[in-house]
Amino acid sequence: MKKILVVDDDAMNLKMACFILDQKSYPVITAMSGEECLEVLEREQVDLILLDVEMPGMNGIATLEKIRQHKEYSSIPVMFLTADATEDTVIAAGRLGADGYIKKPYMPQDFLEQVENVL
């Protein structure tokens, strides 16, 4: 089964994503910051990263940039999971190689479909 890393600074958003992914029995690891995401990637192999954009410290765009620069995990698919759907953010995400963009709030079925399309 594919392992998914969910990164969001909001505990309720993490719980919601984990609950939905659990319905399909996906193993999930969570992180609450960009820095913690990079720490998890040093010790865990994951098949997909769901990454919030607006986080304190290293935001999602900066985190994606670091992920893409790192040889060991640069090829892991990354989808943004965020309420920040500004045109600039979408353009920056695409330029850095984001594999998708899920806008919050989302419907559970739509969320799962988009995740499964990338996996």
Language-model regions, residue ranges each:
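Short hydrophobic/Thr-rich beta-strand motif most characteristic of the beta2 strand and flanking loop
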Residues: 25-32, 40
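C-terminal output helix
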Residues: 106-116
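Acidic catalytic/metal-coordinating carboxylates
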Residues: 12, 32-36, 59-65
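Alpha4 helix (beta4-alpha4-beta5 surface) of REC/receiver domains from two-component response regulators
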Residues: 18, 62, 85-102, 113
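Active-site residues of response regulator receiver
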Residues: 8, 52, 82
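Active-site beta3 strand of CheY-like receiver
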Residues: 44-50
